[in-house]
Amino acid sequence: MEISSSGSKQKSGKTNYQLLLIASLSKEIESARKLDSEKLAAEIRTVGFSCQHCGKCCQRAFGDNRVVIIPPEIERIREFTGLSKLEVAGPFVPETFQPDELDGEENSTEVFSGASEENEDSFFTEFLELFQENIDCEGNIHTFGWTLRRKRNWDCIFLEKGTRRCRAYPVRPMLCRTYPFYLEGLKLHTCECEGLRCPISVEDSRKLAENLLFRYISELEDMLAMYEKYVDFMRDEKGLELAKESLEKGTCTYIVHDSTGITKIIE
């Protein structure tokens, strides 16, 4: 459920750390715009890549399959699929389970807890410890950015059962379009993928390089806008207890910060 107002007590002014991040991001964006797409394409050809259409990058059983998305991507997917914003995306949060804890269900979307009843209390404690500095005095958990929703077995919500094809392929996020490559610190990096070290054409490498640069700059600009809009919040010792009480009742209240502002949701 999405709530229009955060209701969270806020501080005024930007923090020193926030100002440093803004300056650093502005500098990186300026440098990113000067990157040579032809040189990047040549690097991609040296590495080599050909998609194997295995769908493993969409399945949690084969590794971290979270897909970070920015607001314009959410809107494109929402318009294409007819789903609501919160059916497409959820708050970006750390994972608190291991692949052997997957429950195998495919039809419904993910829930925040991967814990059984026996160790529920320890799970809540572990979960909230990850957010200790991001819980406000009212027990709201503040997160930064969004990820694509996943099923209860933690596979991507758009991965078709059986065919392992993407139901939102024409509007898939840039992370998916450029996987297993990404740019960080102005340098090309790769994720683990069976398609690496396979031949790639000049044309395909150029298209991939263009998409990588577009993704890199778009994500940096989105992050910059988020930190420029960000307003710090009040914290106290009661916040952690309030958050735990909510979890014990089966709900979790997030305040998601992104480039458009803040969104309060209850899951």
What is each PLM-predicted segment?
Residues 1-267:
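Short loop/turn segments that flank or connect secondary-structure elements
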